Amino acid sequence: MKRILIAPVRFYQRFISPVFPPSCRFELTCSNYMIQAIEKHGFKGVLMGLSRILRCHPWSKTGKDPVPDRFSLKRNQEGE
């Protein structure tokens, strides 16, 4: 199941992301965050990854935002 959820992210990393300049505002890119979240939390990791993508915009804080040990849709406070 996790492989199926991760496959579209790997496709994005391999074929779509290289076409555009780097733009992620966080350390641990959004696509890598989603992969780690899926590996750690299963389907809930997809929700965490989508939440992270929505937080990745020019007006957000930058910096470290590691995948939390517990499911959460908020930014990991340990990363600040």
From Swiss-Prot:
Function of the protein: Could be involved in insertion of integral membrane proteins into the membrane.
Basic and acidic residues: bias regions: 62-80
Membrane topology qualifier: Peripheral membrane protein
Matches recorded under InterPro entries: Membr_insert_effic_factor_YidD (IPR002696)
Family classification: Belongs to the UPF0161 family.
Region of interest: Disordered: 61-80
NCBIfam families linked: membrane protein insertion efficiency factor YidD
GO cellular component: plasma membrane
Taxon lineage: Bacteria, Bacillati, Bacillota, Bacilli, Lactobacillales
Coarse class of the protein's main subcellular location: membrane
Entry keyword Nucleotide-binding: no
Name assigned to this protein: Putative membrane protein insertion efficiency factor
The entry's keywords: Cell membrane, Membrane
Cellular location(s): Cell membrane
Protein's UniProt keywords contain Membrane: yes
Domain of life: Bacteria
